[in-house]
C-alpha cells in the first residue's frame, strides 16, 4: 500500500500520519509498515535540538496506526463518520534503542486476539533489523456521537 492507500484507512494527517507505506499485509493476521524518520518532523524542534531523538510515544503511535490498518482490513471496512478507532491499552512496552532522523522504522504487528470488540496486538519496531521498541497494544472502534 502506498501513502494514498494508507490515507484511506487512517484519519490522521500531517504532522501525525506516521505510516509511509505498507510492505506486507496478511489480512486477519499481520502487517509490516514503514515510517521514514526525517529531520523535518516537528517533534525534533524540541526533542532534542542538539541531538534529535524520536519520542517513544511517537513510536508507539506509529505502531498503533499500523494496528488500525490491520484491523480495518480484517473487517473489510474503512473508518466512517461517527466512528473512531482508538488505542485503549498499552502493556509490556520496552524501548531498547534510540530512533534518529534518517532511520527507517519497520513496524511489525500481529493480531493476538479479538474479544468483545477489543483487538490485542503484539508489536515490534525495528531499525536495521535491531529491535527498537516492543509492546502489546489494545484497540477498539467507538462511536463518537
Curated annotation (Swiss-Prot):
Gene3D superfamilies linked: Hotdog Thioesterase
Subcellular location: Cytoplasm
Record flagged with keyword Lyase: yes
GO MF entries: (3R)-hydroxyacyl-[acyl-carrier-protein] dehydratase activity
GO biological-process terms attached to the record: fatty acid biosynthetic process; lipid A biosynthetic process
Keywords recorded for this protein, A-Z: Cytoplasm, Lipid A biosynthesis, Lipid biosynthesis, Lipid metabolism, Lyase
Principal location listed in the UniProt entry: cytoplasm
Keyword hit for Cytoplasm: yes
Residues at the active site: 47
GO cellular component: a single term: membrane
Similarity comment: family membership: Belongs to the thioester dehydratase family. FabZ subfamily.
Function of the protein: Involved in unsaturated fatty acids biosynthesis. Catalyzes the dehydration of short chain beta-hydroxyacyl-ACPs and long chain saturated and unsaturated beta-hydroxyacyl-ACPs.
Name of the featured protein: 3-hydroxyacyl-[acyl-carrier-protein] dehydratase FabZ
Lineage: Bacteria, Pseudomonadati, Pseudomonadota, Gammaproteobacteria, Candidatus Pseudothioglobaceae
Gene symbol of the encoding locus: fabZ
Amino acid at each position: 500500500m502506498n501513502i494514498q492507500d494508507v490515507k484511506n484507512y487512517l484519519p490522521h494527517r500531517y504532522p501525525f500520519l506516521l505510516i509511509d507505506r505498507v510492505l506486507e499485509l496478511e489480512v486477519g493476521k499481520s502487517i509490516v509498515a514503514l515510517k521514514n524518520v526525517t529531520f523535518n518532523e516537528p517533534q525534533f524542534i524540541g526533542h532534542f535540538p542538539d541531538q534529535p531523538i524520536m519520542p517513544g510515544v511517537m513510536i508507539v503511535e506509529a505502531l498503533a496506526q499500523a494496528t488500525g490498518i490491520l484491523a480495518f482490513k480484517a473487517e473489510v471496512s474503512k473508518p466512517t463518520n461517527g466512528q473512531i478507532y482508538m488505542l485503549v491499552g498499552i502493556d509490556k512496552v520496552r524501548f531498547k534503542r534510540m530512533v534518529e532522523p534518517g532511520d527507517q522504522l519497520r513496524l511489525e504487528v500481529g493480531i493476538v486476539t479479538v474479544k468483545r470488540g477489543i483487538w490485542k496486538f503484539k508489536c515490534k519496531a525495528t531499525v536495521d533489523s535491531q529491535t527498537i521498541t516492543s509492546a502489546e497494544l489494545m484497540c477498539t472502534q467507538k462511536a463518537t456521537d
